[in-house]
Amino acid sequence: MPPTEPILLTAAEARVLGALVEKEVTTPDYYPLSLNALVNACNQRSNREPVMDLDEDAVRQALHGLEDLHLAGRAHADGRVTKYEHLLGEAFNFSRAETALFCVLLLRGPQTPGELRGRTERMHRFDEIGEVLAGLQKLMEREPPLVAVLPRQPGTKESRYAHLLSGTVEALHAADSDSSTHREAVPIAGSDAGHEERIAQLETAFVELQQEMAALRKKIDDLFGE
């Protein structure tokens, strides 16, 4: 059942939630995520703005906050390593298009429809900008609203959209205006978005391989230690 009261996430909680949603779609073979894999997903340099440097304690604390809000939890698994999953579907019943848009807004902050179209390509393909706008409109019409359009900045042609799980429109606009003085506009092409996602997949696969090797070494040590 969708929440009836506004949700306010910390920056770390928003990053953890976005990373879990992204990895479920882009690297399903490695989802749900272990704590170590989730830390790497949060801190990866591709498809993240800003790039963060969260440690395990910060991610663990963010997970506790998301669990209290029923937005994430521990996955039921037979393995020794605890893994985590998001509960966004249970909370909001998003369509695939809405999930992709909301996820990228969580991971990269305020963006134009054109930027969102390019950056969601690996999660959901939007054939035209009109489909992006339609998805954003549905998120804006939720009660309470989950997305808002920010006032257009001076000298820009397109408005930017932001999710509302981290504050009000006024607060987000102030933060967006401040950060715009330090941000260069970089065109996002579909091929660039795909390249970023392939890098992210390799990063996740490498972490999982390290965990499997560590588990194998432990089994060998236990065997010869008996």
Language model features: what each stretch is:
Residues 10-29, 93-110, 136, 141-142:
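Positively charged, polyanion-binding regions of nucleic-acid-associated proteins
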